[in-house]
Amino acid sequence: MTKFFAKTAAAALIATAFAAPAMAQNASGTIQLKGNVALSCTIAVQDLGQSLSLKNGESNKTVGSVTETCNSGSGYKITLASANAGKLKSGNFTIDYQVNYDSFTGALTSQAVVDRANAQFNKRSDLKVTVPASDQYIAGDYADTVTV
């Protein structure tokens, strides 16, 4: 019986010796993970169809809203431009006005730029208009177009 145990122990020891190198080996490899997010900047402009009370004037009347979405990590720019250089026109007659859009307030005599320092998602800003009251405006239908 002792011989049997000795042979069994020897066989087990040999099997372990051959298995040990396989368990001791340490193999590794690498897997690279890659992906890309495309730049996507969009705006949705909603014209509220408001009529301005020119004779009585308007103070920060909301005339539209803009929803901005841009995933640029370095930010982006929003531009505001007036077709009539910041004036409501009726033929040759004009009425000055000012706009307020987020951090910009002023006349759109030239293109205005609002800088965004980082990405924004569904950022909503209202476009507001201020028109001074006057009894001396000339009769007519006045209009301008603001492009965002």
What do these predicted regions represent?
Residues K3-F4, A17, G75, N92, ...:
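Intrinsic disorder/low-structure terminal segments
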Residues A24-S90, Q111-V148:
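N-terminal small/polar-rich segments of proteins
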Residues A12-L13, N84, T105:
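Amphipathic alpha-helical interaction segments
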Residues M1-A24:
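Gram-negative bacterial Sec-dependent N-terminal signal peptides
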Residues K89-T109:
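Extracellular/luminal ectodomains and secreted, surface-exposed scaffolds of diverse proteins
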Residues M1-T2, L33, Y97, D144:
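Aromatic-residue detector
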